[in-house]
Amino acid sequence: MAPGYHRIVVGADGSPHSRRAVVFVARLAPPRGGRVTCVRVIEPVRLPSMPFVPARMRAQLATQAAAVDRSRRAVAQRQLDAAVSALAKAGWRARGVVRAGLPLQELLAAIRAERADLLVLGARGAGAVRHFLLGSVADAALKRSPVGVLVVR
């Protein structure tokens, strides 16, 4: 591994490409003091403004949305636990973080928070929109990341 890459952020959205990104990093020889933070971003369920819907029904919808968020967070944590385990078995100090928000913004925030020097992403993620060669988050990260970006297919 290049001497400059000791703190890596991996976007781990559970997609096949992101799982390959985790495997790719796991196969690298960890440098002394090297660490990996796997980041899973959950986009919160946003309810539209519903002024004409009765308050009781709005409250029920909000409760259901919160339950969906909790369920998605639990699934994300299980996926992260698997990624962290694979990295730890390969000798990396690794941890997983679930963040809520927009994927690119949260990955960039994680880079800053972890003082990362490399971002590793799968070429395409779990999003509904498919790009021809590169997913929207990977494409935007290549343009906006303050650190090097490694895209794994």
Can you say where each PLM-predicted feature lies in the sequence?
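Structural beta-alpha unit
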Residues: 1-3, 17, 70, 74, ...
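Small/aliphatic-rich secondary-structure junction motif
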Residues: 2-62, 90
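Glycine-rich, Arg-bearing micro-motifs that act as flexible, cationic patches
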Residues: 5, 118-143
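Conserved beta-strand positions in the Rossmann-like core of class I SAM-dependent methyltransferases
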Residues: 37, 95, 150
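Short secondary-structure boundary segments
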Residues: 40, 122-124, 153
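Short glycine/proline- and acidic residue-enriched helix-loop micro-motifs
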Residues: 59-71
